[in-house]
């Protein structure tokens, strides 16, 4: 049996506490962390190709009101509906554009909010 196979057999017989201690000792001995995924080491070689999937994995989005357009009243109504703000707060947000209307929401919620604002005549950006 090879050394690697022997090590695997030993690891199979270890408890969770022993495995935790092994991980910590391994990190201290070799100056590495177990949290770093292998794919990160390959990222610099992939260059821009690896950057594109990272952007697609984004889970939180901001809806930014860039310009309220000509129909501010309709935009204020939509902002109130989306945020639950009072009339004055919603008006201040619309008048102070560009400002975030919703922050850290899912892609579906961000797209739905952006669509409502666009229907009201606003210029919107989802980041």
Curated annotation (Swiss-Prot):
Gene3D superfamilies in the record: 3.30.1390.10, Single helix bin (1.20.5.710)
Keyword Ribonucleoprotein on entry: yes
Keywords linked to the UniProt accession: Ribonucleoprotein, Ribosomal protein
InterPro entries per record: Ribosomal_bL12 (IPR000206), Ribosomal_bL12_C (IPR013823), Ribosomal_bL12_C/ClpS-like (IPR014719), Ribosomal_bL12_oligo (IPR008932), Ribosomal_bL12_oligo_N_sf (IPR036235)
Record GO cellular component, one term: cytosolic large ribosomal subunit
GO molecular function: mRNA binding; structural constituent of ribosome
Tree of life domain: Bacteria
Pfam families named among the record's database cross-references: Ribosomal_L12, Ribosomal_L12_N
GO terms of biological process kind: translation
Biological role: Forms part of the ribosomal stalk which helps the ribosome interact with GTP-bound translation factors. Is thus essential for accurate translation.
Subunit organization: Homodimer. Part of the ribosomal stalk of the 50S ribosomal subunit. Forms a multimeric L10(L12)X complex, where L10 forms an elongated spine to which 2 to 4 L12 dimers bind in a sequential fashion. Binds GTP-bound translation factors.
Family the entry assigns: Belongs to the bacterial ribosomal protein bL12 family.
Name of the protein described by the UniProt record: Large ribosomal subunit protein bL12
Source species of the chain: Symbiobacterium thermophilum (strain DSM 24528 / JCM 14929 / IAM 14863 / T)
Lineage: Bacteria, Bacillati, Bacillota, Clostridia, Eubacteriales
Gene transcribed to yield this protein: rplL
């Amino acid at each position: 049996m090879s050394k690697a196979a022997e090590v695997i057999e030993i690891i199979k017989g270890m408890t969770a506490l022993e495995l935790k201690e092994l991980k910590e000792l391994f990190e201290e001995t070799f100056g590495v962390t177990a949290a770093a995924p292998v794919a990160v080491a390959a990222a610099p070689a992939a260059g821009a190709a690896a950057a594109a999937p990272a952007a697609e994995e984004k889970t939180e989005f901001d809806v930014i009101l860039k310009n309220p357009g000509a129909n501010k009243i309709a935009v204020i109504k939509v902002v109130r509906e989306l945020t639950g703000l009072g009339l004055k707060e919603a008006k201040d947000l619309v008048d102070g554009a560009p400002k975030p209307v919703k922050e850290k929401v899912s892609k579906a919620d961000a797209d739905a909010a952006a669509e409502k604002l666009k229907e009201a005549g606003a210029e919107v950006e989802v980041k």
